[in-house]
Amino acid sequence: MSFLLALDQGTSSSRSIVFDIEGRPVAMAQRELRQIYPQPGWVEHDPIEIRDSQLATAREAIARAGISAHDIRAVGITNQRETTLLWNRRTGAPLHNAIVWQDRRTEPICAALRERGAEALVRQRTGLLIDPYFSGTKLQWLLDHVPGAREQAARGELAFGTVDAWLVWQLTGGRVHATDVTNASRTLLFDVHANRWDDELLSLLDVPHELLPAVFPSSHLYGETDAGLLGAALPIAGIAGDQQSALFGQACFKPGLAKNTYGTGCFLLMHNGDRFQSSANGLVTTAAAQTGPQPQFAIEGSVFVGGAVVQWLRDGLRAIDSASAVQALAQSVPDSGGVVFVPAFTGLGAPYWKPDARGAIVGLSRGTTLGHIARAALESIAYQSAALLAAMGRDAQACGGAAVTELRVDGGACVNDLLMQFQADLLGVPVVRPQVIETTARGAAFLAGLSTGVYRGLDELEALWQPERTFHPTLPPGRASELMAQWEHAVRQTVAS
């Protein structure tokens, strides 16, 4: 039999999953990743730990599958996006810890760029906002703060990459310095229309072109792993940032198809085909996974606190002993009893973009119980996601684009039936949970399988995607609108306070 290996390098852990060619997981291995917090608002990872943990899980997954490396047709890589690394081309040694996407140290750089009036240029070329979230200002910070970095960069001695490029470099023994369009599109340095690094943006951020990796489609033969690393020289044949990989793994290949990943945060992406559309409603435009030369786009919105609100119920409020207990507690009451929970622990993301907002629970009464608060906490995940989809709908309506007719879901919290039903009720469209919810890793495997001939085309992949359960809306539309109005009122109170 033939198999595909997906390397899934995430923020909290490195994972590897072996898939059969039907897209079914055969074996998985996972190792947690140490989080480094040098100062408040700073988040880093050790690049060597990223590499070693990823290699260890790959070897473990192959062993657990009971197969030889020679049975693997191709390797796909998916990764935490925006996290920024800088290393020496000759030695492969990192100059500094990786600066993680959550890191906010470059806000002064971003503020200066906004003051210079650069927002319109950045938005038009990249589809993004000027924000510390993205890689470009992190790279500028490294060049300016690591002793000797600018001088080494000027001599062509350094390489920049997001996590995928770092892994490709390490897996190929430094022979390949490359990334894919989805990861490049998250840097603030990449023209998503022309599919190339942009000289004007590089100049704006004072980044030398010599640092940059080559950029290829997501489904592409990047190179081969060193034979000694995994037991055979395996083709690295697919790369995509985690959210675009999940969109691909959900078989969202056509305009209007959308997925929401319910993790620590929530990431909602809608495929937009070959149409670049700049959002007027607080969303960003990003490159979708690309299987050929033609640019493909997605509209994206991110929620900062999704499943993390359940962690807070467990660790902060101590209302539950385990995250899995939240559904039973929430179902101990018929509804939230008028309680609305706005979990703005770290501000509000899209479509509000209120970084200074802080969490609030409104509508408390003498009759409020922990059950009501737990239910309101779960519902907050659905409310925030519904606000994103409403913003996407307004953008689509403004340009005559396709409206979302169903939402495909994945991520750890998608197994919560109460949450998924409430999500469908708010949206007024079916919410579909697939049989295989490891869609991020599956997307990377699919991309690798396409470029190596395991799959003939997107139609074949579409047929492999199968629903496990569909949640149909049960609320009258008027009631859903009333609930969303209550949510928006609570958000306004939170922001005003």
UniProtKB/Swiss-Prot annotation:
Enzyme class: transferase
Amino acids binding ATP: 11-13, 264, 307, 311, 412
Any one annotated GO CC term: cytosol
A GO molecular function held by the record: ATP binding
Summary of activators and inhibitors of this protein: Inhibited by fructose 1,6-bisphosphate (FBP).
Pathway: Polyol metabolism; glycerol degradation via glycerol kinase pathway; sn-glycerol 3-phosphate from glycerol: step 1/1
Record GO biological process: glycerol catabolic process; glycerol metabolic process; glycerol-3-phosphate metabolic process
Pfam families: FGGY_C, FGGY_N
Organism domain of life: Bacteria
The keyword ATP-binding belongs to this UniProt entry's keyword annotation: yes
InterPro entries referenced in this protein's UniProt entry, alphabetically: ATPase_NBD, Carb_kinase_FGGY, Carb_kinase_FGGY_CS, FGGY_C, FGGY_N, Glycerol_kin
Reactions performed catalytically: glycerol + ATP = sn-glycerol 3-phosphate + ADP + H(+)
Keywords from the named record: ATP-binding, Glycerol metabolism, Kinase, Nucleotide-binding, Transferase
HAMAP family according to UniProt: Glycerol_kin
Function field: Key enzyme in the regulation of glycerol uptake and metabolism. Catalyzes the phosphorylation of glycerol to yield sn-glycerol 3-phosphate.
Protein name: Glycerol kinase
